[in-house]
């Protein structure tokens, strides 16, 4: 499975929102491969292979020399849920049974936010809060291989492989210009990802050669390369409206 969600604000773009502005790339993937063989006879040798491969990217790219204005601005790239499974099962009953099962999951996921350079009079301006997030909150990969054999003399082999790679990254150029009263920059991935392998060889064989092999690799990369120029805006201007009777009708950012 190759799945890519990209939102791109082009070079020189100008966007103004009266209230909130959200720019986001979101991806969710659920994939399952299942191989199952049941066999029998005098001499029987079922083989099963189940392979699941994921390449998933959520990418928010703000290109050079853009102007964006809003009350609150959110820029987000997120893989909201990654769920990948591979299940291989071989079952055989024979005088001379030979069963082999191999399952393999390979998951490569990316959540990327990139902010390019801007001219001196360009900026991303949020009057309230500017939020920049790259996130992968729910990562799950499961690989299961079973070779079940019944007979007199035989061989059982179960191999389960599971590789989970995730990269969660925010990059802001040294000439990226931001202005806001509150700034949140977060690159976050699942701190307790599910990554399981299971290889089993159940059954009964009087003379048996069994192989059970489980291989697991987890690589998580969270990174923020943030060199942007940030201007923190001052307190909002007070707004007071008093009617002809001397009564306060509106009071914003001020106390009496």
Which role fits each region the language model picked out?
Residues 1-256:
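Low-complexity, glycine- and small/polar-enriched segments
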């Amino acid at each position: 499975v190759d799945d890519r969600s990209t939102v791109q604000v082009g070079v020189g773009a100008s966007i103004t929102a009266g209230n909130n502005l959200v720019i986001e790339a979101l991806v969710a993937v659920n994939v399952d491969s299942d191989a199952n063989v049941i066999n029998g006879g005098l001499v029987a040798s079922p083989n099963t292979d189940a392979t699941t491969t994921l390449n998933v990217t959520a990418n928010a790219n703000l290109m050079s020399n853009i102007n964006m204005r809003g009350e609150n601005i959110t820029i987000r790239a997120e893989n909201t849920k990654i769920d990948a499974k591979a299940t291989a099962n071989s079952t055989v009953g024979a005088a001379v049974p030979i069963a082999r099962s191999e399952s393999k999951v390979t998951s490569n996921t990316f959540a990327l936010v990139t902010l390019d350079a801007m001219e001196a009079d360009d900026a991303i301006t949020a009057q309230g809060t500017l939020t920049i997030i790259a996130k992968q909150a729910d990562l799950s990969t499961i690989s299961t291989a079973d070779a079940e054999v019944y007979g007199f003399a035989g061989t059982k082999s179960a191999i389960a492989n599971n590789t989970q790679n995730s990269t969660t990254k925010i990059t802001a150029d040294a000439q990226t210009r931001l202005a806001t009263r509150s700034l949140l920059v977060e690159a976050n991935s699942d701190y307790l990802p599910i990554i399981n392998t299971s290889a089993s060889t159940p059954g009964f064989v009087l003379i048996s050669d069994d192989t059970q092999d489980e291989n697991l690799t987890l690589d998580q990369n969270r990174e923020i390369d943030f060199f942007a120029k940030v201007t923190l805006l001052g307190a909002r201007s007070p707004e007071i409206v008093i009617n002809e009777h001397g009564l306060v009708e509106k009071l914003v950012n001020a106390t009496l």
